[in-house]
């Protein structure tokens, strides 16, 4: 919020927040499909955010604030609306990973129009880095494609490599994000997630964190968007 206030005081948009999933081709295809209206309204979203492992200093708060925070931003952008409520529930905890982290967790978000979203965070699956997004619409189910490695047939088996971190999975998105920032900066404007987007993401993440600690459903309450960010 302080960044939003400082930017408005400066009188010009100066901040591009580092949410790179908006630049991923899979998410862009999903958004185009939703925005087209061809498949009706989005009703439900089923998502997952899985990592092979995380450092030993990870704790419960980081499942939302370091992991699922990316879903909080990209799904708000994808659907074009804010959240109304947030909750976080626990699965049976894996024996893998840090002692202060209950893993996996499920975050449930409801948008202001009533779209229900569930996001699984499993950050010690000891397997691969895997991001999923399925959108259930009135007339179709939309699944996000993902870039793949080649399929190899060898020694009477078929196999395909899997991603092990976000830098492999989202390499093209990172490059597109940075290039967008460079191009916009050279031209003297901001193009991408704004400071207001960052504020909205942090409000929802804070509500989800409170929901996790209290095991309740929490409202997501934003300030009214200033005219400065409506332009």
Regions found by a protein language model. Name each.
Residues 1-55:
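A contiguous active-site-proximal alpha/beta segment in oxidoreductase catalytic domains
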Residues 1-4, 8-9, 183-231:
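C-terminal helix-rich "cap/oligomerization" subdomain common to oxidoreductases
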Residues 24, 28, 69-73, 172-179, ...:
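A structural signal for well-ordered alpha-helical segments within the folded catalytic domains
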